[in-house]
A protein has these predicted regions:
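Short, well-ordered alpha-helical segments enriched in acidic and aromatic residues
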Residues: 35-46
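Residue-level detector of short, conserved catalytic/binding motifs and their immediate flanks
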Residues: 27, 37, 162
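C-terminal-biased regions
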Residues: 3-16, 21-22, 44-179
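Short, aromatic-enriched amphipathic alpha-helices that serve as compact interaction elements
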Residues: 18-34
Length: 179
């Protein structure tokens, strides 16, 4: 079992859902073209975009309202170029092997049978050291958003990993995972 996700007991068959595929394709294309305006159209203003990154040993995250390729988070790590010639595949997400520095499969994947829990894991870890870092409402909001989200991975030299979330009957990009 992948520790970065948990089984989604209410599996929604989005394989035939053109809206999800369109959002994923649109985000990958906008990111490839480094088009801030197009990326920002895929982010809901109420949800913002959460960026996961690793400033040291442990992952952390920050939430932003708008995305800007010229203002990366963290500032010392520019957003790398991403390239995709792959069609979207709805299947188990690829795994990255740190020892070989390779993915176990290549392509663009979205797994609709599990939900991402990276943010909850980061919060749980950070609360061990800073018990008052997050308000109860923030934790509840993160957990609720994860229940309505899917993780997408584009493998490659510069992988692109992001989450999409259903909100008010529409899908939006809500997390960019740079860790």
């Amino acid at each position: 079992e992948n520790k970065d996700s948990v089984a989604n007991p209410l599996r929604v068959d989005v394989i035939a859902n053109n809206e999800v595929q369109h959002l994923i394709d649109s985000f990958v294309k906008a990111y490839e073209q480094r088009n801030d305006a197009a990326v920002n159209q895929l982010i809901h203003p109420d949800l913002g975009l959460t960026i996961i990154y690793r400033p040291g040993v442990a992952d952390t995250f920050t939430k932003i309202e708008t995305f800007d390729f010229k203002k990366p988070i963290p500032a010392y790590y520019a957003y790398p170029e991403a390239k995709s010639s792959y069609n979207l595949t709805f299947d188990k997400l690829p795994d990255y092997d740190c020892a070989t520095e390779k993915w176990n499969k290549v392509g663009l994947y979205c797994d609709t049978t599990v939900r991402p829990v990276q943010l909850s894991q980061i919060v749980a870890f950070e609360l061990e050291f800073e018990p008052h870092k997050y308000a109860k409402e923030q934790i509840t909001e993160i957990q609720k958003s994860e229940k309505d989200s899917y993780r997408v991975i584009l493998t490659g030299e510069n992988p692109l990993v992001f989450h999409l979330q259903k909100y008010n009957d529409n899908w939006y990009v809500t997390v960019l995972d740079r860790a």
